[in-house]
Amino acid sequence: MTVEFKPGVRYRMPAVFGPAPGPRQKPDGTLWTPEEAGTMNAAWMTVKYRTHREQLERILPPGFELRGEPDVHASLAFFNDLYWLAGRGYGIVMIEIAATYRGKTETIDGSFCPVLWEGVPDAIMTGREELGFPKLFADIPALDIDHARGTAGGSASWFDFRFFDVALHGLIEVYEEPKLPGPGGAALYYKYMPRTGIFGSGGCDVAYTTTSQPQPGEAGDTSPIKFGGANFRKWKAAGGSVNWHRATFEQLPTTFHVVNGVADLEIVEYLGAELVEFSAPGQAVSANVMRAVEPAL
């Protein structure tokens, strides 16, 4: 008797060993309960800067257009005490752009993320395959936050090559509604999986947008991270900066083109920086609301 794949259960390669545990299901394929998920803790810093419209447009997938000014939100975050990693954590580096996606029947205003890096393969595999997040790998140490001095910073590297730095100074606590920094609107990602073919002749198996936008006709929060029941704090910075360090093939053999593509987005002007810290129910970051959007063509 061969493997039987159960409907309504998530599988990932190697799929023959049964349902795949992760942030969105337990090893038996059922959902985690709030009691099992416990409480997670996170810190998230973002620097916003303006670049050139034509540079941003070059990295927009089919069906996308810029929404508003050509601004980039570069973020560094670290999640701790994650239930699905048995209490472990990891870091994230990402950029977001305010964009509109026009699908076959839907038009969605949101935050498009062209790329994000994460610090553990477990998070990368689950997010790439299940959610369509364009995740890559990096060594991301815990954030360096000093509230007494009002500073925060961090970095990301791979193969001992540091490709990203961020620094904030003059942090002053403010009291605002709990939400992540960024362009606002639903999360938007472009899922692309190549089809196996001789000398790359297969094209792609899938190429479509995924989003946290509720289904048409449904109301609800558009954020993939839910802050119900969260303890949330926020600081505005007097200033912040980022550095994307261009790489060679020898330094980052399979990802230098991505790092350089982000570095090519010229920083014309810094527009603000902020830091948030929150403790929330573990399931808040499961992103179980993500869905596919049917493309126009």
What are these regions (language model features)?
Residues 84, 110-112:
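Small-residue-enriched, tightly packed secondary-structure blocks
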Residues 112-124:
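Short, solvent-exposed aromatic-acidic interface loops
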Residues 99-103, 160:
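Beta-strand elements of well-folded, non-transmembrane domains
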Residues 23-78:
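N-terminal ordered "arm"
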Residues 89-91, 105-109:
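Extended amphipathic alpha-helical segments with heptad-repeat/coiled-coil character used for oligomerization
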Residues 66-100:
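Short, structured protein-protein interaction patches enriched in aromatics and acidic/basic residues
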Residues 2-29, 128-297:
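Interaction-surface and assembly-scaffold signal
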Residues 43, 91-93, 148-150:
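Residues at beta-strand starts and edge strands
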